[in-house]
């Protein structure tokens, strides 16, 4: 998925399709703009939307733009990530997931040779797989995370506000 803000995704999808073909892998391309996608072989599905929470646990890896939401969902699914950032916070997110050992960062243009090499590395690297599963195991479930957030907000509400008024009183 190139993300919702990518306006020129033709090269990304063309390169990804060639990389999947080279590796003999199936894939699912997600975009609301099918005009950006070249004709695809039957091994690659094109969909405008699929819930990542349903898709990722059944996936071997994820190639994406590096947005924080997609990155977090892949962490929760415990799968390797190949981030191809192009804007905003994506560069920082991609660098961080690489430093964590859960994936790789591949800057644009993400050509098919580089995509296939990086994806093959991620799919074969046992240390990356183990690191992804370890991070997944350390993540709180939605209910636990919500409970912790509520506890944090309630504790913060008990503390007096320091709005700087005391410094200005006189």
Stretch-by-stretch model annotation:
Residues 2-12, 88, 99, 116, ...:
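Peripheral, non-catalytic segments that deliver or gate enzyme domains
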Residues 9-12, 93, 145:
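Residues at alpha-helix caps and immediate loop-helix transition turns in enzyme cores, especially N-
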Residues 1-61:
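Donor-nucleotide binding loops and adjacent catalytic segments primarily
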Residues 113-170:
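C-terminal amphipathic helix plus adjacent low-complexity
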Residues 47-96:
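A donor-sugar binding/catalytic signature common to diverse glycosyltransferases
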């Amino acid at each position: 998925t190139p993300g919702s803000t990518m306006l020129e995704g033709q090269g990304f999808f063309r390169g990804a399709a060639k990389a999947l073909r080279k590796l003999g892998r199936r894939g699912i391309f997600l975009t609301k703009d099918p005009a950006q996608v070249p004709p695809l072989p039957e091994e690659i599905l094109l969909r405008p939307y699929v819930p990542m929470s349903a898709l990722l646990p059944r996936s071997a890896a994820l190639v994406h733009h590096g947005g924080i939401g997609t990155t977090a969902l892949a962490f929760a699914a415990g799968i390797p990530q190949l981030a191809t950032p192009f804007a905003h916070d994506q560069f920082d997110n991609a660098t961080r997931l690489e430093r964590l050992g859960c994936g790789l960062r591949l800057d644009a243009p993400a050509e098919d040779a580089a995509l296939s090499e990086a994806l093959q590395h991620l799919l074969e690297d046992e240390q990356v797989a183990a690191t992804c599963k370890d991070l997944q195991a350390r993540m709180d479930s939605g209910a636990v995370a919500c409970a912790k957030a509520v506890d944090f907000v309630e504790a913060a509400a008990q503390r007096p506000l320091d709005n700087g008024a005391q410094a200005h009183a006189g």
